[in-house]
A protein has these predicted regions:
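C-terminal non-catalytic interaction/assembly regions of soluble proteins
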Residues: 256-359
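Accessory alpha-helical/coil subdomains and C-terminal extensions
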Residues: 97, 108-110, 116-120, 148-166, ...
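Short glycine/serine/threonine-rich phosphate/pyrophosphate-binding segments
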Residues: 12-23, 46-47, 91-92, 103-119, ...
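Short glycine-rich or small-residue beta-strand-to-loop segments that form or flank ligand, phosphate
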Residues: 3-11, 69-71, 104-108, 173-176
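N-terminal phosphate-binding or glycine-rich loops at protein starts, especially the Walker A/P-loop
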Residues: 1-50
Length: 359
């Protein structure tokens, strides 16, 4: 008898269901007696023993289904060692649920915060496999996370649609793309859609340089400009502030503007006199059916996770490295953020194409 647990934690994205399907089908086709426990709403289900038994039927037809059949929630890693409102030790409660069900392995799907808790449980002696999920593609140790390319498709489509209206009305349009700390999604969607300016957290922008790029286009006869702006884009003068002052500055901006894009729009309008419009696709970027690439990626990652379980190899994240699915020790990757190198090939190639990063 093989008993495994599954949970999805953190923000949802495409291909969570497809990845769980890959794990379960990979095991079911190779194990005679298999029990699968699905923990509801992320780590909450593990903490409060909220789970249900899953059968093969539950994984039929979900390859193309967005969201997660188990539900999800955010349980910040920094609070995992803090007792809940009733004094419950959350870590001990998770261990108790795991041992009560006699699990051989717990498979955890999630992003950076989820991964840190997964590593904590590994350190506490549980058999853990982590599968990297996020539209941000910011998990260290894997070239690609499932959900990323699906989100790139959606963000690209949004910018493509804006192109037609921007060119018709001779306006400057800002499309705000998800990504508080890293700019992978904005970078790829910006390149894919032919954006004229890309602003990401890793490359602090100079508003004068941004306006210069817009004016240059106008001088060349282009009456419209498209900016792909990450929600975590930051001005050079703000990036130079000490941590406490930066936090205060960001709080001031948040009080005055719905998001950073509106601040940038106001500044560009004041300096150029051009009409600016802001579009925010928001949570649409996480929704819908996974793209074909993500369906393949999630199936491969899930299948490899199944093989690790069959081989009784635990304590790993399963990721993609140089086009091959690999196992990466959780202790090596947990807590590390994969950011965009300002000198990355993609950035330099985009600049060669005339795309401005405002630097």
């Amino acid at each position: 008898m093989l008993r495994i647990g599954l949970l999805t934690s953190g923000g949802d994205c495409q291909a969570l269901n497809a990845t769980m399907r890959g794990v379960v089908k990979g095991l079911a086709n190779n194990v005679k007696d298999l029990e699968v426990y699905g923990f509801m709403n992320g780590y909450k289900g593990l903490i409060y023993s909220d789970y249900r038994m899953l059968s093969a039927k539950d994984f039929s037809g979900i390859l193309t289904q967005g969201g997660t059949i188990l539900g999800t929630s955010r349980q910040p890693f920094k609070l995992m060692r803090t007792p809940d409102a009733n004094g419950l030790d959350k870590v001990e409660a998770m261990k108790h649920t795991y041992h009560k069900l006699l699990l051989d392995c717990l498979v955890i799907l999630g992003g950076n915060g989820t991964q840190k808790t997964a590593n904590l449980l590994r350190e506490e002696g549980l058999n853990i496999i982590h599968l990297p999920k996020t539209i941000d593609n910011d998990i260290w140790g894997t070239d690609m996370t499932f959900g990323f390319y699906s989100a790139v498709n959606i963000a690209t489509d949004a910018i493509d649609c804006i192109h037609t209206t921007a060119s018709s009305h001779n306006r400057v349009f800002i499309v705000e793309v998800m990504g508080h700390k890293v700019g992978w999604l904005t970078l790829y969607a910006g390149i894919a859609s032919g954006a004229d300016v890309i602003l990401i957290p890793e490359i602090p922008y100079d508003i004068e340089k941004v306006c210069e790029a817009i004016n240059k286009r106008k001088e060349r006869g282009s009456e419209f400009t498209i900016l792909a702006v990450a929600e975590g884009a930051i001005a050079k003068e703000d990036a130079a502030l000490p941590k406490k002052e930066l936090k205060k500055r960001q709080e001031e901006i948040a009080k005055k503007y719905p998001s950073v894009s509106y601040k940038i729009a106001e500044e560009i309008e004041a300096k150029t006199g051009m009409e600016i419009r802001v579009t925010v696709p928001g949570h649409m970027q996480r929704g819908g059916s996974p793209c074909p690439y993500d369906r393949v990626l999630s199936t491969r990652l899930g299948s490899e996770a199944a093989q690790l379980i069959l081989d009784k190899q635990y304590g790993y994240m399963v990721g993609m490295v140089n086009g091959k699915v690999k196992k990466i020790p959780l202790g090596e990757c947990a807590g590390k953020l994969k950011t965009v190198d300002p000198n990355a090939q993609e950035v330099l190639q985009a600049k060669r194409m005339g795309i401005s990063f405002g630097d």
